[in-house]
Amino acid sequence: SVGFKAGVKDYRLTYYTPDYETLATDILAAFRVTPQPGVPPEEAGAAVAAESSTGTWTTVWTDGLTSLDRYKGRCYHIEPVAGEENQYIAYVAYPLDLFEEGSVTNMFTSIVGNVFGFKALRALRLEDLRIPPAYSKTFQGPPHGIQVERDKLNKYGRPLLGCTIKPKLGLSAKNYGRAVYECLRGGLDFTKDDENVNSQPFMRWRDRFLFCAEAIYKAQAETGEIKGHYLNATAGTSEEMMKRAACARELGVPIIMHDYLTGGFTANTSLAHYCRDNGLLLHIHRAMHAVIDRQKNHGIHFRVLAKALRMSGGDHIHAGTVVGKLEGERDVTLGFVDLLRDDFIEKDRSRGIYFTQDWVSMPGVLPVASGGIHVWHMPALTEIFGDDSVLQFG
């Protein structure tokens, strides 16, 4: 059993409140909690609520200078996970005042910043968040959204088609642009920089931007269709990233790209604001997501990262394929695809949706099916993802 040191109070005395009625303005979280042997589930759930809000390991005199009742997170419900021994879903409600407006960064620092290394827990996973309109309304959200993108591209009633230029590393800028032209001329709507194409010695970013823009304009002139190439603006500093975005705008291209997890939410939100102000679409790649979301018992489920991206801002986001080389369960994938596209998503535990989510008027994000898919997957992909999606081959 875990020994708690002298002077340490049980969290559940303050932070486990099963009678609490959640407020419409609360941010609600569902955690999958695996306590250490001997730690009661109520204590583990309360520990999560405390450590991700106002609590520390003991009582301090400054607690008397504020109203903990107003500011504390509360574990308001705990249920055992069916088929798992000693594993629980702990529901935590956070008062809205704990969070800075319009900052996904602050939201994550608060909710998942400290608790995951907690001694009383063997493992912890954030399964879902309910973002109230009172909070989501403080975010710009996607620069444009699904409908505006279709209007910009003049493409309706079908999924958009794209492919990633390969070999992803090693081509010169001119040969890279040549491949972009061939793909776009052949009928694709989009081509894509690979997520690790930034500005390497064999192909500096400005040269790539120039030759890709040339390829886009040539293909547009010959096909009479609007074409795009996701120019990856991800860089080592956010200033450099903005410089690359500005260059793309000057070239008049329709869309740029960002790796939002490696680049970070602060940089991503800045870029999304720039994209709205300057009429650029923003394609989001989720490089590094599996580090965070792949373990069943620990980390953060991708549906939370997807919701966070919709708030931070992006017009496309990679969302798994269900059919390709990388794993993804169909119902769960469709659950977060709906969370990306729709205004109102009902709670549905069979699809992994723990809370009803109301986005009110925040624009939607197009899910991108990408990773090991080829033409024989088309029937399955269109059935799974429907019209509002990007099918990204190669």
From Swiss-Prot:
Question: Site positions for Transition state stabilizer, renumbered to this chain?
Answer: 325
Under the subunit heading, UniProt states: Heterohexadecamer of 8 large chains and 8 small chains.
Which Gene Ontology terms cover its molecular function? magnesium ion binding; monooxygenase activity; ribulose-bisphosphate carboxylase activity
Q: Which residues carry this modification: N6-carboxylysine?
A: 192
Species: Brasenia schreberi (Water shield)
Q: Where in the cell is it found?
A: Plastid, Chloroplast
Keywords assigned by UniProt, alphabetized? Calvin cycle, Carbon dioxide fixation, Chloroplast, Lyase, Magnesium, Metal-binding, Methylation, Monooxygenase, Oxidoreductase, Photorespiration, Photosynthesis, Plastid
Question: Which cofactors are reported in the record for this sequence?
Answer: Mg(2+)
UniProt KW Mitochondrion keyword: no
Documented EC number(s): 4.1.1.39
Q: Where does the chain bind Mg(2+)?
A: 192, 194-195
Q: What else is known?
A: The basic functional RuBisCO is composed of a large chain homodimer in a 'head-to-tail' conformation. In form I RuBisCO this homodimer is arranged in a barrel-like tetramer with the small subunits forming a tetrameric 'cap' on each end of the 'barrel'.
UniProt-annotated catalytic positions: 166, 285
The UniProt entry's sequence similarity note says: Belongs to the RuBisCO large chain family. Type I subfamily.
Per the UniProt entry, what are the Gene Ontology biological process annotations, in alphabetical order? photorespiration; reductive pentose-phosphate cycle
Q: Which domain of life is it from?
A: Eukaryota
- Keyword set includes Chloroplast: yes
UniProt enzyme class = lyase
Lineage of the source organism?
Eukaryota, Viridiplantae, Streptophyta, Embryophyta, Tracheophyta
Q: What is this protein called?
A: Ribulose bisphosphate carboxylase large chain
Q: Which residues carry this modification: N6,N6,N6-trimethyllysine?
A: 5
Task: Describe the function of this protein.
Answer: RuBisCO catalyzes two reactions: the carboxylation of D-ribulose 1,5-bisphosphate, the primary event in carbon dioxide fixation, as well as the oxidative fragmentation of the pentose substrate in the photorespiration process. Both reactions occur simultaneously and in competition at the same active site.
